[in-house]
From Swiss-Prot:
GO BP, one annotated term: DNA damage response
SUPFAM superfamilies with a match to the protein in the record: Clavaminate synthase-like
Enzyme class (EC, first level): oxidoreductase
GO molecular function term, any single one: iron ion binding
Enzyme Commission code: 1.14.11.-
Superkingdom of origin: Bacteria
Protein name (database record): PKHD-type hydroxylase mma_3620
Amino acid sequence: MMLHIPEVLTPAQVSEIRQRLDAADWVDGKATVGAQGAQVKKNRQLPELSPVGMELGQIILKALVNNPLFFAAALPMRYMPPLFNRYEGGEHYGFHIDGSVRNIPGSNLSLRTDLSCTLFLCEPEDYDGGELIVADTYGEHEVKLPAGDMILYPSSSLHKVEPVTRGARVCSFFWLQSMVADDAKRSLLFELDQNIQKLRAKLGDCEEVVGLTGHYHNLLRQWAAV
């Protein structure tokens, strides 16, 4: 499942983060990938343990905790600290698939990368190119969102970032482990949850809505690993 989550950050939060990032020291993005990824990656990133990046990442994670659409879709269990990248002057990232397991910096924990998240920190009109292309069974999907919006998609997806030919594309990106590893089951739960919410808004907590809510939680209880 691929999902656009609007307004994760407010304009004020985006402005604050951009001011801090514009003054930060960036490094070659190849330093954070393996040999295969380094062959197709050309961008810049903040170092994984950058104090600025870690502080700004907490702003993003706190915003997501209060986002019901994100929680319903992702059913998050564990996060990688958000990272930050910048593309300009023709920089790009060719087709690749994210690594399946990552170590969480500064801890002894690892996570399985079930979902990938890209949060846009610049407006689409600020740069040319730079589209995120995600390929799945149904073809290639082009993503270029307003500042503060996020795209959520399975980490098993082949994806790339097109060359940026004007301006700069600045984003945060990170991975998470979901309580429900299987994307099809997670998608089913999300669709069920959204339909329950719509029915509840129309009908209130009638017997049928309560029953469907029970089915949702029983499925989640059966499939979740916590």
